[in-house]
Amino acid sequence: MKFVLFAQLAAVAAPAIAIDLAVQAGQHVMYSYPGLTPPESLYKLTSEGKVGGLIIFKENVNSNLPAIMDKFQALYKASPAYNGHPMIITTDQEGGNVRRVPGGPSQSARQIGDSSTPMQAASQAGRDAAAALKAQKINGNLAPVLDIYREEGNFIDEFGRSFGNNTEIVTSCGSAFAISQSRSGVLSTVKHFPGLGAAKKGENTDLVPIKIDLSLDEIRTFDEVPYRTAIRNGVDLIMTSWAVYPSLDAKYPAGLSRKWTTDELRTRLGYKGVIITDAIEAGSLKSFGNDGQRGVLAAKAGVDILLASGRNATQGEAIVNEIVAALKKGTLSMTEFQESSKRIQALQSRLSA
């Protein structure tokens, strides 16, 4: 009789454990959706506590966006995931041609870096970005870019996304933008660690695998310089690159590489904050399984937030399911994952409720 009762209790308890894991895993996944109207499935996942955040694209933006964001926040607040702090909602508002919502910054990073008063312009750009995002009820920006371009018109310079071609201007402008933006109430993300400044024109990690064959010494004494300052300044998030850097890891792109993410960024550079991937569906990752498998690899590497930006709610859900399965099997460390969850909660606490 005791065995039967125990079996019945176990059968009841098992789903609760699964739900708890799904909620925990969900806080590590940032979802996206197509068009102007979110699908009901995404609202449902949010109410179940399986959505940790959103990324907004230009196709999602009209006059109804603030009300939609309020609805997501209300569902999140009523969900089992709520920890007293808001859901993180982000977009890419770098400036110039790279703006997802109406408003500033009107100048590109390159225009700011080339101006007569670059630090002042960068500070104003950070404030302008924050104002534009807050008007849409968005509380995080996947900007500024800290890549230091090597050639005029290369991948990162083509649309003016880099502040310049030397460590001084990128460090000073990137820091000014990030600090003023964060002080204005919007989370700042610096990207793309350890640097995409050497990528040639057309070498877009969103589309194809890219290898950046620089010496480790050059990366550490040049490309990483702006990140060291950002870390000292307490930057909110760091986004990793999807390029491969053979000088430290010839197999995995930086965002899937424990050598780059944990050993270099966390241990060597001392970063204790939140790390976020670039788009998990990127073409550069085609050799690393489906989106869920990539999410597990990134989590194993030490990344905290997985960016499911394919405009499909099922993409984020698939990543959550793979994370849960890996935690159950023990192929993803529960201890490390819980530490990662604490970092995300600490980040959320920086946002006003």
Swiss-Prot record:
GO molecular function: hydrolase activity, hydrolyzing O-glycosyl compounds
SUPFAM superfamilies registered for this protein in UniProt: (Trans)glycosidases (SSF51445)
UniProt lineage: Eukaryota, Fungi, Dikarya, Ascomycota, Pezizomycotina
Pfam families given in the database record: Glyco_hydro_3
Primary location class: secreted
Name recorded for this polypeptide: Uncharacterized secreted glycosyl hydrolase ARB_06359
PANTHER family reported for this sequence: BETA-HEXOSAMINIDASE-RELATED, HYDROLASE, PUTATIVE (AFU_ORTHOLOGUE AFUA_4G13770)-RELATED
Protein keywords: Glycoprotein, Glycosidase, Hydrolase, Secreted, Signal
Protein family (similarity comment): Belongs to the glycosyl hydrolase 3 family.
